[in-house]
A protein has these predicted regions:
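Non-catalytic N-terminal regions of enzymes
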Residues: 1-139
Length: 141
């Protein structure tokens, strides 16, 4: 992403309407059943896979920048301080390691606003469900 790209009125409206009580990002959740003989580190492999594909979607390395005097919609600009470790996190699902616990965590996560000083996306990889890894994503893109 070489030049600033101004948000459309529609995209900017999601930012303007967002409040701490009403986040406007979208979310996803995927539960992966790992093969019985899997010996790898799912988190590290997932992070490496995302990192290897960032060039396909440069917007994932862009942050918001307000217009001078805030007289226009914000723009996406390349984040020179981009660090994938600020966007992909590892967690452990607390006991009792069940679907209800997972749903409570997802609800808590989606209630938090994304940090507008950084590119507006995050992934969390949770371990703790029997032979499964859970990926939870949030994004404003």
């Amino acid at each position: 992403m070489s030049d600033a790209r101004k948000l459309s009125a529609m995209d900017a409206s999601f930012l303007y309407l967002e409040t701490p009580e009403m986040p406007m990002h979208v979310g996803s959740m995927a539960i992966f059943r790992l093969p019985d003989d899997y010996k790898g580190d799912f988190f590290e492999e997932f992070k490496a896979m995302i990192a290897s594909r960032l060039h396909i979607a440069p917007i994932l390395k862009a942050r918001l920048e307000k217009a001078p005097l805030d007289i226009d919609h914000p723009s996406w600009v390349e984040d020179d301080q981009f660090d994938i470790d600020r966007h992909i996190f590892r967690g452990s699902l607390p006991a009792p390691h069940d679907r209800a616990t997972l749903e409570r965590i997802v609800g808590w996560m989606h209630a938090k606003l994304l940090n507008r000083a950084r590119p507006l996306w995050e992934f969390y990889v949770f371990e703790g469900m029997k032979d499964r890894e859970i990926e939870i994503g949030r994004a404003h893109v």
